[in-house]
């Protein structure tokens, strides 16, 4: 099958009323949520409930290649029927995925989604409190509750939830039917641009402090050991109340093409 060129993300021209969906969430028993099978991919609580799964899936939340089978637990709830009916026979799986407060999904790629003719992954945020950050190719995807987004998750992505509330998305895998590909293309024109991560924004604020303060620049300029430079930069950020990681420092060093001390000279 010929490969189709897809964007990193696209907000589809679909919107959903949140109130009935949130009420339907409340009707799900607490014991129905199961831990995600990729236990090495996350820290904290990453759990889910399957609405539709492949009949040969080894676990309810795991992928499979068989025919889609609907779980019994939601058959009496019209809310889920109404939403899922809009995807017709393109729908291969549907899962509610919850990332608990203080939890994170480590960066990874879903390589099976990048193959020719592979399923298209859609996210419909239901609960997404401030403090949730979904990074795709290192940039925040500005998904809002009630929207529907296509995400190319064969690319590097990670999620963190720094809030005190759970983040819950309805995640759909769909066949690449023509109408869905058209909706993805149509949505690109109005898709908000991804933003730098909060850590990158914090790191850029530190750069501003260093550019204005020759003393800070000198403290870094005298360091010749890479690890010592990174550690000093992290401490400097902490002293200023700026949260970022060694990854942001290393990225700046790579962009500096080796002259990682020279880039800190006050200008």
Each predicted region: which residue ranges?
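Conserved short histidine dyad/triad with adjacent acidic residue
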Residues: 96-115
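Short, conserved beta-strand element in jelly-roll/cupin
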Residues: 98, 115-131
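A short hydrophobic beta-strand segment most commonly corresponding to one strand
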Residues: 120-125, 148-150, 164-182
């Amino acid at each position: 099958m010929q490969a189709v060129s897809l964007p990193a993300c696209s907000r589809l021209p679909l919107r959903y009323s949140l109130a009935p969906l949130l009420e339907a969430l409340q009707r799900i028993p607490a014991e129905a949520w199961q831990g995600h099978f990729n236990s090495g991919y996350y820290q904290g609580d990453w759990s889910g409930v399957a609405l539709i799964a492949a009949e040969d899936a080894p676990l309810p939340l795991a992928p499979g290649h068989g025919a889609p089978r609907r779980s019994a637990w939601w058959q009496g709830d019209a809310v889920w029927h109404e939403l899922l009916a809009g995807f017709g026979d393109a729908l291969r799986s549907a899962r509610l995925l919850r990332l608990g407060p203080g939890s994170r999904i480590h960066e990874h790629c879903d390589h099976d989604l990048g193959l020719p003719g592979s399923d298209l992954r859609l996210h419909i945020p239901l609960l997404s409190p401030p403090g949730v950050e979904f990074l795709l190719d290192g940039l925040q995807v500005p998904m809002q509750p009630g929207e529907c987004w296509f995400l190319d998750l064969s690319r590097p992505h990670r999620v963190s939830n720094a809030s005190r509330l759970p983040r819950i998305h309805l995640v759909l895998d769909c066949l690449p039917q023509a109408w869905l590909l058209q909706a993805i293309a149509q949505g690109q024109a109005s898709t908000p641009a991804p933003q730098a991560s909060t850590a990158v924004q914090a790191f850029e604020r530190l750069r501003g402090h260093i550019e204005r303060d020759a003393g800070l620049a000198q403290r870094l300029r005298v360091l010749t050991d890479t690890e010592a430079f990174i550690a000093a930069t992290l401490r400097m950020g902490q002293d200023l109340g700026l949260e970022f990681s060694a990854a942001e420092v290393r990225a700046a060093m790579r962009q500096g093409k080796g002259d990682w001390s020279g880039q800190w000279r006050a200008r």
